[in-house]
């Protein structure tokens, strides 16, 4: 069921991941698409993964306890003046995702909806489905979105945190690089 769940979305930067029988979904979008994505999906939880998280207003329909802001730059190695994704960041993301009750959708966003958010969504898919093959998930992402470019550092940290023994990084290699775009396009991944 790749590519069909968000056909009604007017904004080109939303992604949905179906998470199982009850059909809760993880929607991934850009900052620009956040209000519309939350409104259209009825999401109860929002995960913000970007620099300058203070600029992100929590959608009024989302409770303060259900909005996690994780401040990190979209970089793959330590750089002066930037905040590299860290083990602490990934622990926060994974704990938040595991605490989501799946009663209503979760929205994960970064600035453009291409790198940090898709990496966090990939990590969430692996965390919520520990027996699902990483390459299968990555191939579905690539098939659904030629521009998805999950941040390799985030994926590597999640791989270690989830005990995937490098399989998530090998899945990124299998996935290949994304096409260059300013913002992401909609796509759907079935989790199980």
Where are these regions (language model features)?
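Catalytic cysteine-centered active loop of the rhodanese-like fold, especially the PTP/DSP P-loop
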Residues: 98-128
């Amino acid at each position: 069921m790749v590519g069909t769940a968000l056909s009604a979305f007017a904004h080109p930067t939303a992604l949905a991941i179906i998470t199982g029988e009850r059909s809760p979904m993880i929607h991934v979008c850009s900052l620009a698409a956040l209000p519309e994505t939350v409104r259209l999906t009825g999401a109860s939880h929002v995960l913000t993964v970007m620099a300058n998280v203070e600029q992100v207003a929590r959608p009024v329909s989302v409770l303060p306890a259900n909005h996690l802001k994780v401040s990190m730059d979209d970089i793959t190695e330590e750089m002066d003046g930037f905040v590299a994704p860290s083990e602490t960041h990934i622990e926060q993301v994974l704990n938040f995702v595991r605490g989501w009750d799946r009663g209503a959708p979760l929205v994960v966003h970064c600035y453009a909806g291409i790198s940090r958010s898709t990496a966090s969504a990939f990590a969430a898919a692996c965390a919520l489905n520990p027996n699902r093959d990483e390459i299968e998930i990555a191939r579905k992402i690539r098939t659904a979105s030629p521009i998805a470019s999950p941040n390799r550092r985030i994926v590597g940290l999640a791989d270690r945190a989830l005990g995937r023994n490098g399989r998530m990084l090998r899945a990124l290699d299998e996935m290949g690089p994304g096409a260059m775009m300013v913002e992401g396009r909609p796509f759907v991944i079935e989790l199980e």
